[in-house]
Amino acid sequence: MSIEDLKNTVTKLQERIQELEKKAGIIPDVPKSVRMVLIGPPGAGKGTQAPNLKEKFCACHLATGDMLRAQVAAKTALGVEAKKIMDQGGLVSDEIMVNMIKSELENNQECSKGFILDGFPRTIPQAEKLDSMLESRKTPLEKAVELKIDDELLVARITGRLVHPASGRSYHKLFNPPKKDMTDDVTGEPLVQRSDDNEDALKKRLVTYHKQTEPIVAYYQKTGIWSGVDASQKPTKVWSDILKCLGQN
């Protein structure tokens, strides 16, 4: 048997082993890509589910608030422009936000297999600008998944919420506690409770959220990419429902 024949035999054996390991559940079957928007009110579980999606699809998680802070801290051209507007008490324009997302998609290696957008778009003009940019890159959105939950349950959830500021990972004192009290499971760093995670502040945020989000949901329903998931369920059930929406059983 020649060296070339041996190489071919080894390659075939490796492929067969991988196939058997996948069937046995030893190697996860990594999907090709994901391009999605995650919609949901504060406390619906986006901070729990987005890292799961990122890991499952080997994609980037673009939480627009974190992205904006990172660009400002790194003093990128867009970050400098955004800081100037924020320092004057203004709102960062849709164009700057869409360009920041575009910059991440072009320069962040994690985005090569797709992206999970979280916190954007919040208005119809933002959704239209985002669609236009993504279509020009030939990477249109495939899915908009909405985490749906009753406001009263949200209030109960959020008043016990704990957050790891650096990563955005979130926990709950009752429903999803960290392994060690007030400590992030991954880094061992301390967790915090956000100052705006109180009942009055939350109710105001929810009024704003519903006003902003209903048109966005209608927009994605019209384009045919919207799916709703009951976010009042246990995180593991929410996760399996999200995967079903994405065609993963």
Swiss-Prot record:
Self-association and partners: Monomer.
Domain of life from the UniProt record: Eukaryota
Protein task: Catalyzes the reversible transfer of the terminal phosphate group between ATP and AMP. Plays an important role in cellular energy homeostasis and in adenine nucleotide metabolism. Adenylate kinase activity is critical for regulation of the phosphate utilization and the AMP de novo biosynthesis pathways.
Entry's free-text remark on domains: Consists of three domains, a large central CORE domain and two small peripheral domains, NMPbind and LID, which undergo movements during catalysis. The LID domain closes over the site of phosphoryl transfer upon ATP binding. Assembling and dissambling the active center during each catalytic cycle provides an effective means to prevent ATP hydrolysis.
Location in the cell: Cytoplasm, Cytosol; Mitochondrion intermembrane space
Gene: ADK1
Record keywords: ATP-binding, Cytoplasm, Kinase, Mitochondrion, Nucleotide-binding, Transferase
InterPro entries in the record: Adenyl_kin_sub, Adenylat/UMP-CMP_kin, Adenylat_kinase_CS, Adenylate_kinase_lid-dom, AK2, P-loop_NTPase
High-level lineage: Eukaryota, Fungi, Dikarya, Ascomycota, Saccharomycotina
Name of the protein in question: Adenylate kinase
PROSITE patterns: ADENYLATE_KINASE
Region ranges (Disordered): 177-197
Similarity comment: Belongs to the adenylate kinase family. AK2 subfamily.
Catalytic activity, EC: 2.7.4.3
Enzyme class: transferase
Binding site for ATP: 43-48, 161, 170-171, 233
Catalysed reaction equations from the record: AMP + ATP = 2 ADP
Positions bound to AMP: 64, 69, 90-92, 119-122, 126, 194, 205
Keyword ATP-binding belongs to the record: yes
